[in-house]
């Protein structure tokens, strides 16, 4: 059975989040959280929060054992971008896109329904 957690509108670019996700994909939840705890990335904190939420959803909503959970699917989708203006020389302006990310984690205990 699977349980899912989504964190939306995280103010970090998806391209910065995806390499951190690759480190924990397919690993047991406890091991994934241990890996993320010692990474110096902002993305690691946000991913850890989402994994903990998925684990809580699995144990509270679906009565799954928290020790048996693995990170089956984890991916980052692009959210809306905040558009800002940066003044440039000669009266011009450049657009700055502050990107956001939607983080999705699906944990599985390996049992079929």
Swiss-Prot record:
Keyword Ligase: no
Any GO BP annotation: translation
GO molecular function: rRNA binding; structural constituent of ribosome
InterPro entries: Ribosomal_uL22 (IPR001063), Ribosomal_uL22_bac/chlpt-type (IPR005727), Ribosomal_uL22_bac/org-type (IPR047867), Ribosomal_uL22_CS (IPR018260), Ribosomal_uL22_sf (IPR036394)
PROSITE patterns (alphabetical): RIBOSOMAL_L22
Cellular component aspect of the GO annotation: cytosolic large ribosomal subunit
Keywords tagged on the record: Ribonucleoprotein, Ribosomal protein, RNA-binding, rRNA-binding
Quaternary structure note: Part of the 50S ribosomal subunit.
Family: Belongs to the universal ribosomal protein uL22 family.
Functional note: This protein binds specifically to 23S rRNA; its binding is stimulated by other ribosomal proteins, e.g. L4, L17, and L20. It is important during the early stages of 50S assembly. It makes multiple contacts with different domains of the 23S rRNA in the assembled 50S subunit and ribosome. The globular domain of the protein is located near the polypeptide exit tunnel on the outside of the subunit, while an extended beta-hairpin is found that lines the wall of the exit tunnel in the center of the 70S ribosome.
Protein name as it appears in the record: Large ribosomal subunit protein uL22
Organism: Roseiflexus sp. (strain RS-1)
Top-level taxonomy: Bacteria, Bacillati, Chloroflexota, Chloroflexia, Chloroflexales
